[in-house]
């Protein structure tokens, strides 16, 4: 599930940036 993992990481990064 590499694609899914990458997508998840991308979403997490976006959320972290928004929360930062």
Curated annotation (Swiss-Prot):
What GO CC terms are in its UniProt record?
Answer: extracellular region
Per the database record, which ranges form the Peptidase S1 domain?
1-20
User: What Enzyme Commission number(s) does the record list for this chain?
Assistant: 3.4.21.-
Mostly located where? Answer: secreted
The keyword Manganese is annotated on this UniProt entry: no
Task: Spell out the post-translational modification annotation for this entry.
Answer: Glycosylated.
Per the record, the domain of life is: Eukaryota
The Gene Ontology biological process annotation of the record reads: proteolysis
- Provide the family line: Belongs to the peptidase S1 family. Snake venom subfamily.
Its function?
Snake venom serine protease that selectively cleaves the heavy chain of protein C (PROC). This activation is thrombomodulin-independent.
**Record text on subunit structure and interactions:** Monomer.
Write the protein's name: Protein C activator
